[in-house]
């Protein structure tokens, strides 16, 4: 499917469903361009789409949307498969997905960049300066930089959905959790780091995370399909995730899949954001362009550079600030061919976003691999293979 055809289908699909309250938004994405003009071999890009379609057919996920862009232009926008195992409608270019942990970078990290630019957030300040409730042995030594690099020493997660009943109780449990290691000494990917950091952002912003991001990022950048807590009127455009058998006991459609984020009311720093490939293409293009898009300078170029470089905390970690970078050896969701200066992230529901500033290229892959169950882990191979196929398709990087 061509980019023009995919965009047309998205508009027609939205229009045919009639009005809703609020209306279902139509995302524009970034301008499309012929793949060859951006250095891509169209046949090789088609091969990447063919691989993705075969992965859907083999059960890796019900459906997916792949978006590839370069130089601020969209070279490929390819929906494949269906909405869900139980919903055989074909995926559209504008289908909305639960981003899961892409929330950490698209939402939370972007918010931190804005607050750093404003001089409100200091990366090496102790977390307790902003959240005094963050208490326990050695926690006075935990900094914002530690939270962003997952080196604070916090546990990976807590069963908040089972052990607490309110948002306030959940936040208290997170803030008073004992560290497993001294700050800065070990890397442990932690949802708790993102939940603590969300509290920092909300206090500095003076408003809830979702409102701050809508006002400062998603609104100005024209990302109308990106938000927490999507309204019921959006339901038909959202790809279902899991048939939840442990907490909510229903098929999740438009409800955050992550249990901790659900206990926090659907708005959290670790998960909860919904979006589509078109909207995300705008943020990706902005980040590759030094924080600017069109006439909007959303983030200082120096801030983008700092947040997307490896911090080496602890020594040998691949983490940037919020973002990750490709592994030096072994498996990486980025594949094996993106440059070492690339940055990206994944989401548990089957989403990923990788950006390569050396090639000025991004790869967005949105799937709902947890439908109908999270036991399906075929996405791990698919992510890296798609990334490699897309890089191989860039046969003229000099353009």
Regions from the language model: what does each represent?
Residues 1-6:
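Bacterial N-terminal signal peptides that target proteins for export
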Residues 342, 349-362:
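Short, surface-exposed beta-strand/loop micro-motifs that present aromatic residues
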Residues 36, 54-69, 86-146, 181-193, ...:
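Short active-site loop at a secondary-structure junction
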């Amino acid at each position: 499917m061509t980019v023009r055809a995919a965009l047309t289908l998205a508009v027609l699909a939205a229009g045919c469903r009639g009005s809703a309250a609020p209306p279902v938004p139509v995302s524009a994405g970034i301008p499309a361009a012929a793949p060859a003009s951006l250095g891509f071999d169209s046949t090789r890009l088609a091969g990447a789409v063919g691989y993705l379609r075969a992965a859907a057919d083999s059960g890796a996920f019900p459906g997916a949307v792949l978006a590839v862009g370069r130089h601020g232009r969209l070279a490929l926008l390819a929906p494949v498969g269906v909405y869900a195992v139980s919903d055989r409608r074909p995926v559209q270019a504008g289908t909305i997905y639960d981003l899961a942990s892409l929330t950490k970078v698209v939402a939370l990290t972007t918010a931190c960049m804005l607050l750093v630019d404003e001089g409100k957030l200091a990366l090496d300040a102790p977390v307790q300066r902003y959240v005094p409730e963050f208490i326990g042995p050695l926690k006075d030594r935990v900094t914002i930089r530690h939270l962003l690099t997952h080196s604070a020493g916090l546990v990976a997660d807590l069963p908040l959905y089972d052990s607490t009943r309110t948002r306030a109780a959940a936040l208290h449990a997170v803030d008073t959790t004992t560290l497993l290691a001294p700050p800065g000494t070990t890397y442990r990917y932690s949802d708790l780091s993102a939940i603590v950091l969300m509290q920092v952002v909300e206090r500095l912003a003076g408003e809830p995370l979702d409102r701050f991001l809508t006002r400062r990022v998603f609104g100005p950048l024209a990302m109308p399909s990106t938000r927490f807590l999507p309204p019921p009127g959006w339901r038909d455009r959202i790809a279902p995730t899991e048939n939840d058998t442990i907490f909510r006991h229903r098929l999740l459609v438009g409800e955050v899949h992550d249990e901790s984020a659900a206990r926090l009311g659907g708005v959290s720093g670790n998960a909860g954001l919904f979006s589509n490939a078109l909207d995300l293409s705008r943020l990706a293009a902005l980040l590759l362009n030094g924080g600017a898009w069109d006439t909007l300078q959303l983030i200082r170029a120096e801030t983008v550079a700092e947040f997307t470089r490896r911090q080496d905390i602890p020594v040998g970690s691949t983490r940037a600030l919020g973002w990750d970078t490709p592994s030096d050896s072994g498996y990486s969701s980025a594949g094996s061919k993106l440059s070492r200066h690339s940055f990206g992230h994944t989401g548990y529901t089957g989403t990923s976003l990788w950006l390569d500033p050396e090639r000025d290229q991004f790869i967005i892959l949105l799937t709902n691999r947890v439908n109908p169950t999270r036991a399906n882990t075929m996405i791990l191979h698919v992510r890296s293979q798609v990334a490699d196929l897309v890089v191989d398709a860039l046969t003229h990087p000099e353009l």
